[in-house]
């Protein structure tokens, strides 16, 4: 049977036949013709595939698992490079006084790819569990003083995301930069000085449309405060219901006061600022209000992609936490309570990093504290419905064309 992709006409090149005499599609071997570069040349595989040099083998005591150990860590560094590449593109799109809303899909796509890579890494690191602790001991001596703590790209990634220096856990009671040389320190200093993703997201959220009151609309936050007060009043009414037993009344009253205190901490700007100073919150009050508005009205066309952005930011934090946790379990399994190859306290140090201190977008997780039932969510004015139904950049472009 003739291959359907050949079409009519004479055959001028070689044709390969499948088993049974079935023709495959016509093709040309461009390598034989000297056309362009090969797959191996394009990917520079001669460099990549010769970079797995086993120290144990050079010492005449080859340990096969060292090969896996090297490949896993090299693969991590390649993926870190891709995440940083995508992160820089996202930061570039956000680093504008007015973010082009027609570009938010690119931001969403970039963050989506980052989460997929991080998801892959959380699974990839578990491949090291296929080594036995005894096999690891056989080649561990060749690693000293090399340590994953010295991964420049991982620290660059943390800084570009927005991990605050004051929130870092001390490494052997020292600053994290002490393990890097002068060239690497310059790179790290630049990443500490430039705007992180957290800073850019904060500025973007502060400009959420409809957040502030105008002559035409009183704004989201004023309406939200009124709705919260109504919600709290209803909770107080439930607690004071004469039909409640003494025990139920006590529980409902305690719940009311706890809920009221939680809402007061976000409604009062001074309390919010105090939480920032205490290190419990990272986003400004206006940025937090913007995120709240996006949460409540995520079904509006103009907020659908911003809501996805906020979701992916939390996914990034979650996946980093999962990766750190998997790493901790791996180290505990392989080393127990031994000191790390770089001189750290090993398991104990790594376990301390699996905490909210390293969550860049912790405030987004905590937004659920101040969500109110749907029946209390403030209604949007007709003017605001129109505003949130049209992308500002698209509307401006269309009006310019009509002019």
Curated annotation (Swiss-Prot):
Entry keyword annotation includes Iron: yes
Alphabetical list of SUPFAM superfamilies matching this protein: Indolic compounds 2,3-dioxygenase-like (SSF140959)
PLD motif, short sequence motif: residues: 133-135
Alphabetized GO MF terms: heme binding; metal ion binding; tryptophan 2,3-dioxygenase activity
Pathway: Amino-acid degradation; L-tryptophan degradation via kynurenine pathway; L-kynurenine from L-tryptophan: step 1/2
Effect of gene knockout: RNAi-mediated knockdown of the protein increases longevity and causes a delayed and extended reproductive life span without increasing total progeny. Animals show increased levels of tryptophan, reduced sensitivity to proteotoxic aggregates of alpha-synuclein and reduced age-related decline of motility. A double knockdown of tdo-2 together with an enzyme downstream in the kynurenine pathway, kmo-1, flu-2, afmd-1 or haao-1, causes an increase in motility and tryptophan levels and suppresses the proteotoxicity similarly to knock-down of tdo-2 alone.
Comment on bound cofactor: Binds 1 heme group per subunit.
Tissues expressing this chain: Expressed in body wall muscle cells, hypodermis, PLM neurons and touch-receptor neurons.
Reaction(s) catalysed (UniProt annotation): L-tryptophan + O2 = N-formyl-L-kynurenine
Source species, domain of life: Eukaryota
This protein's UniProt keywords: Dioxygenase, Heme, Iron, Metal-binding, Oxidoreductase, Tryptophan catabolism
GO biological process: L-tryptophan catabolic process to acetyl-CoA; L-tryptophan catabolic process to kynurenine
Residues reported in the UniProt entry to bind substrate: 69-73, 140, 341
Cofactor: heme
EC numbers for this chain: 1.13.11.11
Binding-site residues, heme: 327
Pfam entry (one): Trp_dioxygenase
Subunit structure of this chain's protein: Homotetramer. Dimer of dimers.
Family: Belongs to the tryptophan 2,3-dioxygenase family.
Task performed by this protein: Heme-dependent dioxygenase that catalyzes the oxidative cleavage of the L-tryptophan (L-Trp) pyrrole ring and converts L-tryptophan to N-formyl-L-kynurenine. Catalyzes the oxidative cleavage of the indole moiety. Involved in regulation of protein homeostasis, longevity and reproducive life span. Specifically regulates proteotoxicity due to age-related aggregation of proteins like alpha-synuclein, via its effects on tryptophan metabolism.
Protein name (Swiss-Prot/TrEMBL): Tryptophan 2,3-dioxygenase
Annotated gene: tdo-2
